[in-house]
Amino acid sequence: MRHMKTILTALAVLLFSGCGDRTQSPRDSGEVDGPLRIAIAGIAIESSTFSPAQTTIDGFRVTRGDEIFGAYPFLSEDSPARDRAVWLPTLRGRAIAGGIVTREAYEAMTEETLKRLEAAMPLDGLFFDIHGAMSVVGLDDPEGDLIARIREVIGTDVLVSTSMDLHGNVSERLAQESDLITSYRMAPHEDAIESKQRATDNLIDRLERGLGKPAFKAWIPVPILLPGEKTSTRIEPAQSLYAEVGPMTQRDGVTDAAIWIGYAWADEPRNHAVVMAYGDNQAAVAQAAEELAEHFWRVRHDFDFVAPTTTLDTALAAALASAAKPFIISDMGDNPTAGGAGDVTWTLAQLLERLEFENPDGPSLIYASIPGPALVEEAIGVGIGGQVDAVAGAMVDDRYSPPVRLRGVVEAIEHGDGAAETEVIVRVGS
């Protein structure tokens, strides 16, 4: 343990902001007068470099101006925080997890963000809301590139508060360019809104009190890479590890601390775990970060999947023999919430070949879900109760299995899903 403490201490990078003295803000220099002026910007996607897909601009939901407030209930029109500053929402790009982002899509959103920020100047602060696991063609640190380019527009004195997913990646450049930085403390991310509010609360608090940039930041890269399926904070060891973060922020001289698991499904130098802390007391900040990093390293071999892992045949046998219903089987090899294509048909093809599901007296199974635009269009045309015969899946990733043909009866048609837009349920076999 003593040897590991030495290693982690050597890895700790103290990033000094103002070298312990409060830096001059735009308000100090007379550039800004009146209420606090805080901009909002950010691009967020979790994108796997191992997926054959690419995410274009059409894959993003881009909001601008006052429409952005809808994503932040703590900034609603009647919220206390809304009255504490003039909020200037610029551009917010969001996409469901997917493949690497095209350079054209990234540049289009970035350039528009920069223009909108320039028009919003002068500023006291920026709420920088990102995921942290965006991959872009030709870049190995997109979020670091984005914040560096933003700095070229807003300058070094504007206070930047960054909010991230705990499965994001924190490069040294992103850590340096962010004055305040925080992440979710729960997986599943039940505290997403709470974490974003913490980012804005810390930002407003420092601006209102005239504290400026924190004097010290500690950034510790931890050489661990874990998949999300092993990092639920509802079970150990992540439960106890993340339970330590909150108390760390109550220490004198520590404003906030965070642990990033990192993102396993992109082949980039920044993909690893990170621990950070920041505040105005150098010793307290360093100690908080090192204690969290040491705990993380100590339990690194204890992370495990949240459920037993096995082959499809074994899982199906267990499901059919189980008295507990429904029995849920997760195909985590094609996880669309982590950047997988979500249309690999291998598992569905295996299920369609099993005779027990053809028997009218046999078991039933719900497969959720597989993309199939042609099937959806046909289902809408024939309506509920109609017969469909169309292919689905393997439009993005056909490396393991081709598209499957589904012949069956339309059981339901649902409109309005935020990602899929239209969903249909087709009964096949028994």
Predicted regions and their residues:
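Sec-dependent signal peptide recognition
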Residues: 2-10
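Bacterial signal peptide processing site
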Residues: 20-22
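Glycine-rich phosphate/diphosphate-binding loops that line cofactor/substrate pockets in enzymes
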Residues: 31-34, 82, 115-124, 315-327
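Hard-cation-handling environments
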Residues: 36, 226-430
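Active-site histidine-anchored catalytic micro-motif
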Residues: 39, 43-46, 50-52, 103-110, ...
